[in-house]
Swiss-Prot record:
Required for rescue of stalled ribosomes mediated by trans-translation. Binds to transfer-messenger RNA (tmRNA), required for stable association of tmRNA with ribosomes. tmRNA and SmpB together mimic tRNA shape, replacing the anticodon stem-loop with SmpB. tmRNA is encoded by the ssrA gene; the 2 termini fold to resemble tRNA(Ala) and it encodes a 'tag peptide', a short internal open reading frame. During trans-translation Ala-aminoacylated tmRNA acts like a tRNA, entering the A-site of stalled ribosomes, displacing the stalled mRNA. GO terms for molecular function: RNA binding. It is found in: Cytoplasm. Its main location: cytoplasm. Keywords: Cytoplasm, RNA-binding. It comes from Prochlorococcus marinus (strain SARG / CCMP1375 / SS120). InterPro entries: SmpB, SsrA-bd_prot, SsrA-bd_prot_CS. The gene is smpB. This is SsrA-binding protein. Residues 141-165 are annotated as: Disordered. One of its GO terms (cellular component) is cytosol.
Amino acid sequence: MSKARNNKKSKLSKAKSNRRLAENRYARHQYEILEDIEAGIELLGTEVKSIRAGNVNLRDGFCLIREGSLLLHNVHISPFNNAGSFFNHEPLRVRKLLAHRKEINKLETQVNRKGLTLVPLNIFLKGSWIKITIGLGKGRKLHDKRENEKRKQSEREVKSALARY
């Protein structure tokens, strides 16, 4: 009987620990996401504390592949408040992403095609690890954005009309 109780607790703690810490909604508007990959991030201690507190901005972020490694640029992680200025990290430093070699090579071949880029979509906790979702996206033109917005608006209207009846 105690095993069943422990099993319930572990399921609850796993569900609680898999939570989204930051999301890049702007990337989904600017890019048509073709594929997404989950990767780890190489972080410093104060960066981990800041991310867990929700002090991260993914909006201007992008990823590059240099010398076979995946690098995250322009993601702002605010300095941790309770650490002294000497021990804190640089907010916009380049961070290495941890992914399998096959995934990196596959992404590199796709990025070399015209018009594709790697953008961070969200940062989340997976157990005690901080992970990031990287999206392979193709930039949208202005008319594509307008068309997408019209489609979403019509879906909202239909949904609200069905809710009334």
